[in-house]
Swiss-Prot record:
Residues 1-10 have a biased composition (Basic and acidic residues). One of its GO terms (biological process) is assembly of large subunit precursor of preribosome. GO terms for cellular component: cytosol. Pfam families: DarP. This is Dual-action ribosomal maturation protein DarP. It is found in: Cytoplasm. It comes from the Bacteria. Its main location: cytoplasm. Residues 1-20, 171-193 are annotated as: Disordered.
Length: 193
């Protein structure tokens, strides 16, 4: 309970500032939940009682009304136990980590593509050394066509196809997970820049 402890004279419970901080954290958590797609929301351990409030918050577009609805959602979230809110936070963190890893994997594939276009055969030899299952002839032809398209200002069909081939190779060979010498290739990319 709140109030002073009769024996020691100290206050019991959280201070007002701490309560405000906790309320703002829950409000921010509610904003994150509203920003999720229905598919992402379905993967989270959100109580059924909160789903209609989240959907209503998504529906409202007026700034002040939306903020008021978020505050209403936060009020309902504060009624949930701490374990439920912690589970939602953990699941959101896991989702953001997964998304971050996926974006990083795409960036690595893009760096390989740019390096192949800039360095040509030297970068191709390094890629083939790290990933022997890659088709040398197909990669060389795609690189050549992408350079030709870029020079003639044509649509980047081969450029996109090169990305798709590298992405497929990364998924098959473990480029995304950091296996098969990715760290070597990644550091080589960073050394050249």
């Amino acid at each position: 309970m709140r109030g002073r402890d009769e024996d020691t004279g100290e206050f019991r419970g959280a201070s007002r500032s701490q309560q405000r901080r906790e309320a703002l954290e829950i409000f921010d958590l509610g904003e994150k939940l509203v920003a999720l797609t229905p598919a992402q929301l379905a993967k989270l351990p959100v109580p059924e009682s909160l789903i209609p409030h989240i959907e209503e918050s998504k529906r409202i577009t007026s700034h002040i009304a939306h903020k008021r609805q978020l505050a209403f959602l936060a009020k309902h979230m504060r009624r949930e136990d701490d374990e439920t809110l912690a589970a939602i936070r953990d699941a959101l963190d896991a989702n953001s980590d997964t998304a971050r890893r996926e974006v990083a994997a795409i960036h690595r594939v893009e760096r390989w593509r740019e390096r192949l276009l800039a360095d040509g055969d030297a970068a191709l030899a390094e890629l083939l050394e790290a990933y022997p299952a890659a088709d040398r002839q197909q990669l060389r032809q795609l690189v050549r066509n992408a350079i030709h398209e870029r020079a003639k200002n044509k649509p980047p069909r081969a450029y996109r196809e090169l990305f798709q081939v590298l992405r497929d190779l990364s998924q098959e060979q473990g480029l995304e997970s950091g296996d098969s010498g990715l760290e070597d290739g990644e550091s080589a990319l960073e050394d050249d820049e």
